[in-house]
A protein has these predicted regions:
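Membrane-interface alpha helices of multi-pass inner-membrane proteins
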Residues: 279-295
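Membrane-interfacial entry segments at the cytosolic side of transmembrane helices
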Residues: 65, 94-106, 277-278, 317-329
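Membrane-interfacial loop-to-transmembrane alpha-helix junctions, especially the N-terminal start
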Residues: 29-45, 216-223, 276-283, 321-325
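Transmembrane signal-anchor helices characteristic of membrane glycosylation enzymes that use polyprenol
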Residues: 102-128, 329-340
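Active-site lumenal/periplasmic loops and adjacent helix-entry segments of GT-C-fold
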Residues: 115-230, 239-249, 254, 258
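Perimembrane helix-loop-helix junctions
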Residues: 301-326
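Specific aromatic-rich, kink-prone transmembrane helix
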Residues: 249-273
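Membrane-embedded, hydrophobic transmembrane alpha-helices
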Residues: 1-96, 315, 333-340
Length: 343
């Protein structure tokens, strides 16, 4: 019974709360949907986690203060999202999404994806990088600190690790572990793979809806194609598909599989479309979320936004779009400057 309660808490904090909170930033979007609500909620949760974690690191606050702060912010956002959904009277199903008979191809894709979720969770790969990432989370939980103890030695840091401290994704793992009452290794190897692989396919489905807006069968075939490609991605240990299946609980893998594709999708809908599909706030949150996941995310998210900025200028000659895109790059640029200063 105790394990059932912990699993329900994991579902609450990793699915229900972000899903409800996503309605806050999507309340005015014409492209809102159940899947986008969850993705937007994660952008919000990761952004708050990044900001609060960095503040806690520099202020040397204990982990429980950070945990209660993030829980309060996300719970408030979830309540607000539910209220906004009730006011709009369309629940969380989105604006004008068609519901009808499910495509046979989509059912096949769903079965393939479900098998991947089971395989990733119950046949978990043990990775050497866990010696730092999972150990940092475990150390933080058991010492009630935030990036204060070196997981390799057990001694306090004399100098913060510049490579990791600005992207404290292990601290997010520690927060979730503390909130749900499960060991960080269990959360990383059993819970996170299910959630993040599911999110990766949600992002791919957003592309399918963009490319095949009126053809449900084509969307299903596209998802089958993606699932099969990912199943047979082990020809290299360096591609994003392999990262997705083998070590999705690590920030760099989650970045490559979920959040960079999501950032590109949002950038296309906001910067490269004449009629803006989502708010600029969502793009800003996406940049901050990439910063949380990995130090590479700080660089790659900024590079992607700059490329989209140039493409937007060429297409629309809009200084307003360029200025807004530049503002969305600010978190990456600021963290890049901080990295140069502390290394």
């Amino acid at each position: 019974m105790n394990m059932v309660i912990k699993c329900l808490l994991a579902a609450l904090w990793l699915l229900a709360v972000p899903w409800a909170a996503g309605g806050v930033v999507l309340c005015k979007s014409k492209k809102s949907s159940m899947g986008m609500n969850l993705l937007a909620g994660y952008l919000m949760m990761f952004s708050f986690a990044e900001i609060l974690a960095l503040a806690a690191i520099w202020a040397k606050l204990p982990l429980h203060v950070l945990k209660y702060s993030l829980a309060a912010v996300m719970a408030s956002a979830a309540v607000l999202g539910i209220v906004l959904a009730l006011v709009k009277r369309n629940g969380f199903t989105g604006n004008g999404e068609k519901t009808g008979k499910m495509s046979f191809y989509f059912v096949v894709a769903a079965i393939l994806i479900l098998l991947q979720l089971v395989a990733a969770s119950f046949l978990a790969h043990m990775d050497a990088d866990d010696a730092f990432y999972v150990a940092t989370a475990t150390t933080s939980v058991h010492t009630d600190t935030v990036f204060s103890i070196n997981p390799y030695t057990g001694y306090s840091y004399t100098r913060l690790p510049s490579r990791y401290v600005l992207s404290p994704f292990p601290i997010f793992l520690a927060l979730i572990s503390s909130l749900v009452g499960l060991h960080p290794a269990i959360v990383a190897h059993v819970i996170f793979p299910v959630v993040f692989i599911f999110m990766a396919y949600l992002v791919l489905y957003q592309y399918a809806k963009r490319w095949f807006p009126e053809d449900e069968h084509a969307r299903g075939i596209f998802m089958i194609f993606c699932a099969v490609l990912i199943w047979f991605s082990a020809y290299s240990v360096y591609n994003s598909e392999n990262f997705q299946m083998i070590r999705i609980w690590q920030g760099k893998a989650c970045l490559a599989s979920v959040f960079l594709p999501l950032l590109l999708y949002l950038g296309i809908g906001i910067i490269l479309e004449k009629e803006q599909e989502y708010s600029w706030l969502l793009l800003l949150l996406a940049d901050i979320s990439c910063c949380l996941l990995s130090s590479m995310g700080i660089i790659l998210a900024c590079m992607m936004l700059v490329i989209l900025l140039i493409m937007g200028l060429v297409r629309f000659h809009s200084l307003q779009k360029a200025a807004c895109t530049a503002l969305c790059c600010l978190p990456s640029l600021l963290l890049g400057l901080v990295y140069i200063m502390i290394r």
